[in-house]
């Protein structure tokens, strides 16, 4: 991808973010934009960084590690947003600053145990808000117990929720439901040292406007910025 094309895509995306924020009286500077770069090259990520995208989301561990090696000179915030295999938690804990796809106490515990000394890992709980059997994520009825038990784990900060809606779910309905759950769960953070509950990660290229208007403060965009995967 040419740098000029990426910069143009980013400019248009920022305009859409600004408009969505204006509609709900939200400050656009409160929105974290994560560039999702699965199948994109390290050179494309470097272009994105130079254009101002400093948070990068990756779905596949080995692909991400290769890119990280090529981009050590950049101060990138790396987010793991894919499905987590138990045998990969050590490498995820060692190499990423954020993990968006925690859906069990077992995974949270492994990430906590395997996080390097002196490092704090930011975790988001993936919520299956529409109860889609084909999607990963914890059911809303189980999330309070998971968060409460995870408060005893060292080396992590529980920052909030990550949402991926099912294809058939109306984003207006799905995201508003998720936002209500997020706000309700904020009460859990009182008196808990490692619960911060300040991050609602929801919204992708096709529906990030609705997500922002429903309360998201972190969006994960790939196609809008980089075009079809691998280009």
Feature locations, PLM:
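Short C-terminal tail/terminal secondary-structure segment
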Residues: 221, 226-231
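Divalent-metal-activated hydrolytic enzyme cores
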Residues: 217-218
């Amino acid at each position: 991808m040419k740098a000029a094309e990426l910069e143009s895509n980013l400019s248009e995306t920022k305009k859409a973010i600004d408009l969505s924020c204006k509609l709900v009286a939200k400050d656009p500077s409160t929105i974290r934009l994560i560039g999702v770069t699965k199948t994109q090259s390290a050179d494309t990520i470097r272009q994105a960084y130079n254009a101002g995208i400093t948070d990068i989301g990756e779905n596949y561990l080995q692909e991400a590690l290769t890119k990280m090696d090529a981009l050590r000179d950049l101060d990138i915030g790396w987010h793991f947003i894919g499905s987590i295999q138990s045998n990969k938690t050590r490498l995820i804990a060692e190499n990423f600053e954020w993990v968006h796809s925690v859906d069990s106490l077992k995974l949270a515990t492994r990430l906590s145990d395997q996080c390097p000394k002196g490092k704090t890992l930011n975790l988001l709980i993936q919520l299956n808000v529409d109860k889609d059997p084909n999607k990963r994520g914890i059911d809303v009825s189980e999330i309070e117990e998971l968060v409460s038990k995870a408060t005893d784990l060292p080396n992590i900060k529980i920052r909030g929720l990550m949402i991926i809606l099912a294809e058939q779910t109306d984003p207006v309905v799905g995201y508003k439901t998720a936002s209500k759950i997020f706000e309700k769960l904020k009460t859990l953070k009182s008196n808990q040292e490692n619960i911060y509950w300040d991050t609602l990660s929801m919204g992708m290229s096709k529906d990030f406007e609705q997500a922002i208007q429903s309360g998201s403060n972190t969006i994960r965009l790939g196609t809008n910025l980089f075009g079809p995967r691998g280009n």
